[in-house]
């Protein structure tokens, strides 16, 4: 299982910015092209890995969690909530400050309420900044985060709780898949 994901990671292009090796991958960057078979494989793996019977909503961060969350929502019938990078000024909107390995900014939560049971889905975890910010904000609202799952784990970021990943990678001159969890 996960053959398409592993192959696509191990053959993806690399670029270097400010001494940091970035891998360019359809799941994390949306380029060069996002193949439906890859999305289907990821969705099937997440459905197997997660206990979604206890989940009311799928929460994804804009932008690269959206396609993964959409696949999971279509496969399960669970509604998806997108944490946006733009403020809408809706009643109850919560601003979240996010710091990742490559950016800082605000994210905005809408449509999430105390007692909601959610799973957080994202493309990559490397520093854990997005996950920590979401966990903090969701906790303040009273949302129960049932689980967290990412497609690609780079390193071992500590986010203050357990999370699941489909693959774990090391990045040197190229991507090496060192573990797959499905």
Swiss-Prot record:
Pathway: Purine metabolism; IMP biosynthesis via salvage pathway; IMP from hypoxanthine: step 1/1. GO terms for molecular function: guanine phosphoribosyltransferase activity; hypoxanthine phosphoribosyltransferase activity. GO terms for cellular component: cytoplasm. It is found in: Cytoplasm. Keywords: Cytoplasm, Glycosyltransferase, Purine salvage, Transferase. It is an enzyme of class 2 (transferase). Gene3D superfamilies: 3.40.50.2020. GO terms for biological process: IMP salvage; purine ribonucleoside salvage. It catalyses: IMP + diphosphate = hypoxanthine + 5-phospho-alpha-D-ribose 1-diphosphate; GMP + diphosphate = guanine + 5-phospho-alpha-D-ribose 1-diphosphate. It holds the Pfam family Pribosyltran. Its EC number is 2.4.2.8. Belongs to the purine/pyrimidine phosphoribosyltransferase family. Archaeal HPRT subfamily. Homodimer. Catalyzes a salvage reaction resulting in the formation of IMP that is energically less costly than de novo synthesis. This is Hypoxanthine/guanine phosphoribosyltransferase. It comes from Methanosphaerula palustris (strain ATCC BAA-1556 / DSM 19958 / E1-9c). The gene is hpt.
């Amino acid at each position: 299982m996960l053959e398409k994901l592993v192959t696509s990671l191990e053959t993806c292009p690399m670029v270097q910015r400010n001494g940091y090796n970035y891998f360019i991958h359809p799941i994390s960057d949306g380029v060069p092209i996002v193949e439906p078979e890859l999305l289907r494989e990821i969705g099937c793996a997440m459905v197997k890995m997660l206990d979604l019977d206890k989940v009311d909503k799928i929460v994804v961060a804009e932008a690269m969690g959206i396609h993964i969350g959409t696949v999971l929502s279509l496969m399960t019938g669970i509604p998806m909530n997108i944490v946006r990078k733009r403020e809408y000024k809706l009643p109850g909107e919560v601003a979240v400050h996010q710091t990742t390995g490559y950016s800082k900014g605000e994210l905005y939560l809408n449509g999430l309420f105390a007692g909601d049971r959610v799973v957080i889905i994202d493309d990559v975890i490397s520093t854990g900044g997005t996950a920590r910010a979401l966990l903090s904000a969701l906790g303040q609202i009273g949302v129960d985060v049932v689980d967290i799952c990412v497609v690609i784990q780079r390193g071992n970021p500590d986010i203050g709780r357990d999370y699941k990943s489909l693959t774990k990678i090391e990045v040197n001159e190229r991507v090496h898949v060192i573990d797959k969890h499905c």
